[in-house]
């Protein structure tokens, strides 16, 4: 069995529940002001710029950032958990400002009536997310349509996410028609339906990630770029598991519509295989665009065809 990329998170050995202590858990780094509720800390920054440092704890709360530029940082990576609460029926953190950055936070058990419960919902502005975990929810990160929005994800884990219970699907990471998406050094695993990464962004960089489907259930594509995309998919490890709703391809390009040009999309340096003990065939790149791609050297395992046009 080949070695897969391991999560790069520095997780605390034990995560304490929110305790009664003398110091409020939400601290504005620039001023030292403290708050007992995250939403109050966010509102205190308003249209300005600031960093909220979050003390260890498991929090049954959420927040909406309506303006400004805010960084949300765990004082100790992996010691902060947002558990089971979504604002506006959407996510633990809903972003409608200019910019948001999230560092070292765990999001879990988030479910809402429309089955799009997410750790992060980006409705406006740019997002940078680093060193976090999204687990056992309907979705990890979901973004609205927004052709000027940019999303960067680094060193993070997406586990136990997604589903298509009635044909309306959620995915581990779902990006709308945005300007760009970058996903690096991250791990996708144990999907519970839908795709691991679905993006309608015009430009895509997906590099150095692990897509481990060996314990997935009723999953579909590892990467779905349904509207086409430029950019690159490089140096990733893909393993297709047994329990698939659709095992016809690892990467799907332009399967729904062609909004963005895919000419020159680089797909190289990837390691692609079907999990041991599974006797079937699949295709690494299912291409509906018929545009000239730049497919370089990839390590392709038994039963995997490099590409086909559909």
Question: Which stretches of residues belong to each language-model region?
Answer:
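Bacterial N-terminal signal peptides that target proteins for export
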Residues: 1-6
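N-terminal signal peptide c-region/cleavage motif recognized by signal peptidases
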Residues: 14-16
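Acidic Gly/Asp/Thr-rich repetitive segments characteristic of extracellular carbohydrate-active
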Residues: 22-61
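Surface-exposed or flexible loop/turn and strand-edge residues in extracellular/cell-surface modules
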Residues: 23, 49, 56-61, 67, ...
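Extracellular beta-strand-rich solenoid/capping regions of secreted or surface-exposed proteins
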Residues: 43-47, 59-73, 81-103, 108-125, ...
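Right-handed parallel beta-helix
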Residues: 55-56, 69, 73-79, 99-109, ...
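Extracellular beta-strand/beta-solenoid scaffold signature
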Residues: 84-93, 113-121, 136-145, 165-175, ...
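Leucine-rich solenoid repeat scaffolds
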Residues: 279-310
